[in-house]
Amino acid sequence: MQTIYTRITDIKGNLITVEAEGASLGELVQIERADGRSSYASVLRFDAKKVTLQVFGGTSGLSTGDKVVFLGRPMEVVYGDSLLGRRFNGTGKPIDNEEICFGEPIPITTPSFNPVCRIVPREMVRTNIPMIDMFNCLVKSQKIPIFSSSGENHNALLMRIAAQTDADIVIIGGMGLTFVDYSFFVEESQRLGFADKCVMFIHKAVDAPVECVLIPDMALACAERFALEQKKNVLVLLTDMTAFADALKEIAITMDQIPANRGYPGSLYSDLAVRYEKAVDIAQGGSITLISVTTMPGDDITHPVPDNTGFITEGQFYLKDNRIDPFGSLSRLKQLVIGKRTREDHGDLANALIRLYADSRKSAERMSMGFKLSNWDKKLLAFAELFETRLMSLEVNIPLEEALDIGWKILAQSFHSEEVGIKEQLIQKYWPKACLHK
């Protein structure tokens, strides 16, 4: 039963307050304005009969006499195959100039998947980016952020991952996007040929902050249905979680909440965790793998958003100098697939390459300080140049097996086989034959 109220007692920012009974948190509300227009809101807080609503699209033009209708259900988004290839805003309305999308309405605020039905991740998600596939494998159901330094083109990296992944469906949630960013997503999805298996939920920088916080929920609600009902392997890409946290902060300040670290609400950790925990590998079903972008203001890893994120997720990719930094990046689930779902030489080769690259950084530092370089230093510097060009560049698009072969070739071009610290049985099997006795 719908309840109608005609008295708005307070309007502050995108929040309004009404005197109402029987409201529930997250309940969807329709506001019918005097000029005939209507907008939606959701219940954010209530204190006895005093109910605070966050209005989608802003409160401009509202008057205290407008009708407020409690719909008795939570915010919903349409689910179905008709979503594929479509783009929606933070309220679930199409923004691609196409017809209204028909499908099953599903609530966007549901609990995390039942832990009893989860299985231990054991399958790799391929991206054809060597710095991910080879050194920090992405595993089905993993939740992992990309920590992006200022000025890094993280959107291009996301589009590369979306285009090259072997996931069945890609769902993109964009928060605080400029028009240039939004246009880039649309154009790249069409140019790279994955638009037909992609769904986009987009919040632009000019849209209301309350719509920003709904984007992850909409994306993950649809992903969960695709994984559960259609047994699809879904890759969810969220950007930018710092913009999401800033929207939470703006709403909390408007509600006069006591701020915590750097003005963010004390619930920031829980607000992030409840979204990340949607990542799941379902027994007898599909999976949800979640990659998010978290920009670091001032390259500060101790900023509340990346700091809290690091405690929730299963590693991180550190994007710096237009590369995925091998020393700041980590996948805590990679041991579940390396050598088990990949070639036997994967783990030893990756460790040797990173160890030698770390040594080359020390040699580069000695060279910059004017020290005399040894023959070993020169070998390391030559190796580093090959490694950065052929494996570290984000422009490289090769499958894992080819990346492993290239890794062996780089070692053979730079070192003797006994200098790399790899097991003799692997050397005999994988070291390029022409260089075996080098």
UniProtKB/Swiss-Prot annotation:
Annotated PANTHER family: V-TYPE PROTON ATPASE SUBUNIT B
Domain of life where this protein originates: Bacteria
Keywords in alphabetical order: ATP synthesis, Hydrogen ion transport, Ion transport, Transport
Keyword Ribosomal protein carried by entry: no
Keyword Ion transport carried by entry: yes
Protein name according to UniProt: V-type ATP synthase beta chain
Role, per record: Produces ATP from ADP in the presence of a proton gradient across the membrane. The V-type beta chain is a regulatory subunit.
GO molecular function: ATP binding; proton-transporting ATP synthase activity, rotational mechanism
Protein family (similarity comment): Belongs to the ATPase alpha/beta chains family.
GO biological process, any: proton motive force-driven plasma membrane ATP synthesis
Underlying gene: atpB
